[in-house]
Amino acid sequence: IIILLIMILAVGAVFFKRYGSSNEEADKEQYYGIENSDDLALIINNEVVKKEESSAESSSDSSTDSVIPGKVFDGQYYVAYQVLRDKINSRFYWDANERVLLYTLPDGNVSVSENSSEYTAVNETKSEDYVILKTDGDIAYIALPFIQEYTNMEYSVEQEPNRAIITSKWGEIETAEVKKDTQVRYLGGVKSPILTEVKKSDKVTVLEDEDDWMKVATADGYVGYIKTKFLKNQKKEKTSRDFTEPVYSDMTEDHSINMAWHNVTNAAANNAVQQVLASTSGLTTIAPTWFSLADTEGNISSIADADYVNYAHTAGLEVWAVFRDFHGG
């Protein structure tokens, strides 16, 4: 009997080892790609952003091999410019030569210098109670609350490890409620390491349905897998945020545009407009190169000519003047 009992226990142990659930916990710093104590993990629109992803998308204009997506400086949370541009708000522009961050509004620019809590919004100087723009070499890091001021986004911050959960895409999502206390695992399968525990009635966002397992995102920034049988009340929801997007004016035409460039290098060259147009047909627009930078102070030189415009209009053409940025202009 004893031998039989031992055999049953041995078989049970082998069976559990093969099919039982693992209690191994995932290395959270490795999961988020955290290498240093001041790194900030970023979860943007239910995606964990890691160094390799941010550097791959920014390799064309960055002198670094890799970019840490987020940082913590003096208790404030910052996002790398490359990540901001690619994944949150592409209207921000970091000028690494001038060391200034720019954002264009319909009525003017917002500009921030590095290591400054002050910024210029159109023609007004404003300030925050934190440094807005930090730098690490040529990599710019922008404070999250400043980004939010000009972006339709929400964010929350969690510790252990430091991470920011950012939502900048709004619309329809799928949610579910947790039936009972269980685990979210790194991959679908009981042997996969545990990322976090979820409690009964917790709400998760459903990202993918993989039959026995669901890929979900938790409110505190974990993206992993949970057994389908532990979820209930799956439903579609609309998400939105009260934010007024800036309206940028533009011009439209009610016809196709057939445009020709006219390389005008000096004032006398304007006199050739009649000859130039005589050799064309079907044009709607002519674009003479009339303007250029005159000096390093930003002054502009012009060789625009009223007679040129009048002749073009008589010929039924619109004139779109061009700012020359070549041939020393």
Regions found by a protein language model. Give the residues of each.
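SH3/SH3-like beta-barrel fold
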Residues: 103, 201, 213-218, 226
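Short, solvent-exposed loop/turn elements at domain surfaces
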Residues: 51, 184-187, 215, 266-273, ...
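Chitinase-like catalytic core of GlcNAc-active glycosidases
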Residues: 254-263, 267, 277-280, 292-329
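Conserved residues at the C-terminal ends of beta-strands
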Residues: 289
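Extracytoplasmic/secreted envelope proteins and their assembly/folding machinery
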Residues: 81-85, 144, 148, 270-273, ...
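Conserved, mostly hydrophobic/aromatic
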Residues: 286
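Primary recognition of N-terminal secretory signal peptides and signal-anchoring hydrophobic helices
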Residues: 1-210, 232, 239-252
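A short macromolecule-binding patch
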Residues: 179, 220-231
